[in-house]
Amino acid sequence: MPGVSAHGLSCEERRQLAVDLTRVLALYRSILDAYIIEFFTDSLWGTLPHAWQEVLDGLNPPELATLLLGMPREGEEIRYRSVWPLTLLALKSTACALAFTRTPGFHTPSEFLENPSQSSRLTAPFRKHVKPKKQHEIRRLGELVKKLSDLTGCTQVVDVGSGQGHLSRFMSLGLGLMVKSLEGNKRLVARAQRLDQELLQALDKMEKRHPKMVQRSPRHRPHHVVQWVSPTTLCEELLLPLEMPGQSSTRLLLTGLHACGDLSVALLRHFCCCPEVVALASVGCCYMKLSDPGSYPLSQWVAGLPGHELPYRLREGACHALEDYAERLQKAGPGLQTHCFRAALEAVIRQVCPELRRPGVQGIPRVHELKIEEYVQQGLQRVGLDPQLPLDQAALQAHQAQENRVVAFFSLALLLAPLVETLILLDRMLYLQEQGFYAELLPIFSPELSPRNLVLVATKTPLGQAFSILETEDS
């Protein structure tokens, strides 16, 4: 899916993009605000223009992926079987034109061509206990942090929200960086320390077996600290330097791999407020967990725009995986019926218990093997209602017959969702810009592997042409 490159936009172009985004989101807010499980209870199909209904009603899932989402199969031509209304074509074009591009400088991650479970770019010890998605992420972000550290003269990297320490471990023991690793969950910290020791032992064995292949250099394991980081107050532990002989001053680089909700905002505020922090590389996620107000909007510019508000539902939608859903549409598998079944269940729940709205239904296993009435019965039991209630079979079959409409409406919302993410990240760039700093966004991960793939890179002095080094894939 094409889009606008965040890198290289002037300050004025960034402001204008924010204006355009707020206008478009206000125009289509009814689609973004909708809950797909209320498709039948709120007659969501009827909220679409009649001309849109006519066009979308005739599309099967692969056609929705190709024609609406603009994600055809490799080598597939985009051909419309009918004339689409200009308003729908305008929506599609606008959604593509205003969203930050999520396509990195490489297409298929070459590291997984030989084995989809093992990155060929990481040695076996660094792959152990790490899923393929995380292997890709720690390698790509770790290498970017290493380059950024070299460019800005950083003496120490602080990995905030480090979890089990996979990124910290790769940066310190794989790339030779001095790393402090902050994580609020003490059990995760204890596991990270065990994995550190396990990796050190594996590297020692490898060095003994292949002394010429392994670089002999001092190994600095990550320094793990149990520490919660608040989005509103400065964390002294984050700023404390590691004791290193011969070091006269501390220059910190903050990083976070999918720093959840307010944690990404905390990194920005520490970067802005603390002179010892000279660089930032942050990949955010879980936008629905942002405090409101306080964590969005951050910039004065976006705060002053009419229609800038992003309620919970919009921020939640921005966390969906567009590329993954497009692939599911292309395969047209039975799993696509889940939204339709859940919407049918919601309609039954409202009939039985009108005050019970959108209750959480814990995952019902093997939905694709169930009949719609079986799904509804299991769902009723999960929300504390009688699963043996008499069901209107004709109504359920009528709902199931609209499965493609449910999928089409959800696809429309997904088409718009990247605009919400773009506005959130653009607001962060504008905030840093208003503080007098320099910020860029780069698509760093393959979006098929890691949907939240935009890294916010910030520095206190301009990098100029040197910034292009961060965009390249190491050979």
Curated annotation (Swiss-Prot):
Residue ranges of the TM segments: 406-426
One Pfam family per UniProt: Methyltransf_32
UniProt subcellular location: Membrane
Coiled-coil blocks: 185-210
Topology in membrane: Single-pass membrane protein
Primary subcellular site in the record, as a coarse category: membrane
Keywords: Coiled coil, Membrane, Transmembrane, Transmembrane helix
Gene Ontology cellular-component terms listed: membrane
Family recorded in the similarity comment: Belongs to the METTL25 family.
Name listed for the protein in its UniProt record: Methyltransferase-like protein 25B
Source species: Rattus norvegicus (Rat)
Organism classification: Eukaryota, Metazoa, Chordata, Craniata, Vertebrata
Gene it is expressed from: Mettl25b
